[in-house]
Curated annotation (Swiss-Prot):
The gene is RPS26. It comes from Encephalitozoon cuniculi (strain GB-M1). This is Small ribosomal subunit protein eS26. GO terms for molecular function: mRNA binding; structural constituent of ribosome. Component of the small ribosomal subunit. GO terms for cellular component: cytosolic small ribosomal subunit. PANTHER family: 40S RIBOSOMAL PROTEIN S26. One of its GO terms (biological process) is translation. InterPro entries: Ribosomal_eS26 (IPR000892), Ribosomal_eS26_sf (IPR038551). Pfam families: Ribosomal_S26e (PF01283). Belongs to the eukaryotic ribosomal protein eS26 family. Keywords: Cytoplasm, Ribonucleoprotein, Ribosomal protein.
Length: 105
């Protein structure tokens, strides 16, 4: 069993809800698996043609950020997150203890 029941809600009562990007099911906002992806607006095949056609030496390709939100079942199905053993669940990826310590000071 997970320590936080798969949620990031502490002392908030109720969290808002979001819709899954894949299936459309309603999921609590703190339970949803969120990923932020930066994607180029121009695909790589046409980027070379654009680079030859432009007169500028340095051409910055426009990019856009996409925030994806998935329910737990869709995130497991799409292999965004995986089922982990009870010991492996204790490992927190992307967790920086120094950042938390500086926020409390």
């Amino acid at each position: 069993m997970r320590r936080n029941h798969g949620r990031g809600k502490k002392n908030r009562g109720s969290a808002g809800s979001i819709q899954c990007d894949k299936c459309g099911s309603v999921t609590p906002k703190d339970k949803a698996i969120k990923r932020f992806r930066i994607q180029s607006l121009i695909e790589q095949a046409s980027f070379d043609d654009l680079k030859q056609a432009t007169i500028y030496d340095v051409f910055e390709v426009p990019r856009m950020g996409y925030k994806s939100q998935f329910c737990v079942s869709c995130a497991c199905h799409a292999k965004i997150v995986r089922v982990r053993s009870s010991q492996a669940r204790k490992i927190r990826y992307g967790f920086n203890p120094n950042r938390v310590a500086s926020a409390h000071n």
